[in-house]
Amino acid sequence: MRFKELVFLLKIDEEELLEKLYEEGFFNFAIEENKEGDRLLRVYLREGETLPSFLSNWKILDERLTTPKDWMVELEPFEIVEDVVVDPTEKVTRTDKIVVKLSPGVAFGTGLHPTTQMSVLFLKKYLKKGDRVVDVGCGTGILAIVAKKLGASYVLAVDVDEQAVEVAKENVQKNSVDVTVKRSDLLSEVEGVFDLVVSNILAEIHLRLLEDVSRVTHEKSILILSGIVDTKEDMVREKAQKKGWNLLERKQEREWVTLVMKRS
């Protein structure tokens, strides 16, 4: 599949950008920094797809036709956290580390973003072998795949976006792991009880998740919430506390915060 790639100078903060893109159901994008330190937004349009409306008056810096393989070619394998390697090339054969083969399809979710890195860090720390895990808002499926490779007995990955579900299924297959992937608006299609819930989405969506997450967890379950901009951390923590979740640990990279919680 060929895409039209458009490059813009990022004029708004990253959290506001993600909100606007998600509101329009747009997931084909990447955020990067050039040599001059400018933040750039790359968006990828399928044939017949329209540009998100808020970008219509932004100046286009560059435009070209491309494919998912084209935009991944510049990415080399990299260690997202200690002993966990993301491999966009599918050429890494080492067995001394957890290797995640990744074909994004959508650009966001390659593992380069600090929210993904912090989520993986806490999965390594809190996931116990044999745990049942659900990844809510799975995107490319990277967190679900890591959870399975860390020893989870059962992993469910859900996303409201059909395209993300298809990409996650493709990545699960590439990694030869047993992960169930399906479409669900947060936990609406999720049944059963899980030992660990991980979710790397926006703060406002976490508020919705917290309304229902107790239904699929037990008193010792761990909840990892990432994708929270620091100015909205208190809002999420207050909601979590009201719903019976206590803070175990937090980590911040740049303006992004990840929280680890346990039922009180």
Curated annotation (Swiss-Prot):
InterPro entries: Ribosomal_L11_MeTrfase_PrmA, Ribosomal_PrmA_MeTrfase, SAM-dependent_MTases_sf. S-adenosyl-L-methionine binds at residues 116, 137, 159, 200. Transmembrane segments: none annotated. It is found in: Cytoplasm. GO terms for biological process: methylation. GO terms for molecular function: protein-lysine N-methyltransferase activity. Keywords: Cytoplasm, Methyltransferase, S-adenosyl-L-methionine, Transferase. Its EC number is 2.1.1.-. This is Ribosomal protein L11 methyltransferase.
